[in-house]
Amino acid sequence: NANLNEVLGVEPEVTLGELREEIERAGIDPRYQIPSGMTKQAYLEMRLSDAIAEEDDYDLMVMGRTQGQGCYCFVNGLVQTQVQKLQSHYPYIVVDNEAGMEHISRGILPMMEVAILVSDCSRRGVQAAGRIAKLMKELNFKPQKTGLIVNRVPDGKLDAGTLEEIRNQGLELLGVVPHDDQ
């Protein structure tokens, strides 16, 4: 997600989106240079370790965003490749995606044990979470567990309409996060 690092108070040295810009603009824009004799692939491999912010209890890799026009295909491919490389080094990998279905429909994260969908307490938000859960089934994703966390809930209590929509979508409610003005 483009702002999870901000919520956690982590400033990465570089994001995957910024790496994409470096690679795309190398040789065209003098601000972006790859060392002489080094291929773009070798440079990318070297710089990917800079995209992981190492904290006391976790490490964080930030996708970020591109600086200009362009497809996220390259960055999405980086995320997929890095998750595959890193999964043997960590007991857990949490991927915080932007809202929507792109990461699921593109198969960027094909292997997952647990899928936690997060929604606000609006009917539309819960319906979107239900569509994502259905898409995962259609695309043959097989997490061992799929559930919903509802975020920003007034007084930490879901109203009857939201609970009914969660049931209608066939989602398992894992928990709620109360609204916090801070």
Language model features with spans:
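Fold-independent oxyanion-binding glycine-rich loops
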Residues: 1, 63-65, 97-98, 121
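Short active-site-adjacent helix-start/loop capping segments
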Residues: 3-6, 69-70, 103-104
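Cytosolic-facing regulatory segments adjacent to core modules
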Residues: 40-50, 54, 59-95
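Conserved catalytic-core segment of NTP-binding enzymes
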Residues: 73-176
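C-terminal boundary of histidine-terminating zinc-finger modules
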Residues: 182
